[in-house]
């Protein structure tokens, strides 16, 4: 299952994120895409880790309460790395976590929250997918004889392991 391929259509992506916010059970499995159930299960399993990343006292929740979403999502989305399925699923689960825990006293209506989260996230996913396709379509001759920028900047020790971020372990 390729999460980015499944999420190419905005309405499908939106439905998956919406479905993942429901409690586990027959309704979620029957009504929504199978990916919504997978993402929802990840959220339930990893909720403690998400709370470590964004505790209840974090400024993000105050911004959401006041209806400010552009700045937080700009910060979240610019650092987004989607090079493997684990990170893709973790990102979708994080979006679901944000929606599940959005402050109930927010000035943003429940219906608008979904689009405030999904629109910028889906746009970023599309940009990431297009860039990955372009890089994959480049002929091998472009890369011959060139050292890796990552190797030069980061050193070998960073190439052998995954991200230090607890969300993406």
Swiss-Prot record:
Family per similarity comment: Belongs to the adenoviridae E1B 19 kDa protein family.
Species annotation: Canine adenovirus serotype 1 (strain CLL)
Alphabetical list of PROSITE patterns matching this protein: BCL2_FAMILY
Descriptive protein name: E1B protein, small T-antigen
InterPro entries: Adenovir_t-Ag_E1B_19kDa, Bcl2-like
Key words of the record: Early protein, Host-virus interaction, Inhibition of host apoptosis by viral BCL2-like protein, Modulation of host cell apoptosis by virus
Signal peptide span: none
Domain of life of the organism encoding this protein: Viruses
Record flagged with keyword Kinase: no
Gene Ontology terms: biological process: symbiont-mediated suppression of host apoptosis
């Amino acid at each position: 299952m390729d999460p980015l391929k499944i999420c190419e259509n905005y309405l499908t992506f939106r439905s998956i994120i919406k479905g993942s916010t429901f409690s586990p059970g027959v309704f979620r499995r029957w009504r929504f895409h199978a990916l919504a159930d997978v993402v929802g299960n990840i959220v339930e399993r990893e909720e403690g880790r998400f709370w470590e990343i964004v505790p209840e006292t974090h400024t993000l929740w105050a911004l959401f309460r006041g209806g400010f979403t552009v700045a937080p999502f700009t910060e979240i989305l610019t650092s987004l790395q989607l090079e493997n399925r684990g990170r893709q699923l973790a990102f979708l689960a994080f979006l679901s976590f944000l929606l599940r825990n959005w402050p109930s006293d927010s000035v943003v209506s429940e219906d608008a929250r979904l689009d405030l989260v999904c629109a910028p996230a889906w746009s970023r996913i599309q940009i990431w997918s297009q860039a990955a396709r372009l890089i994959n379509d480049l002929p091998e001759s472009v890369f011959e004889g060139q050292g890796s920028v990552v190797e030069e900047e980061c050193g070998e020790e960073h190439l052998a392991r995954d991200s230090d971020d607890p969300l993406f372990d």
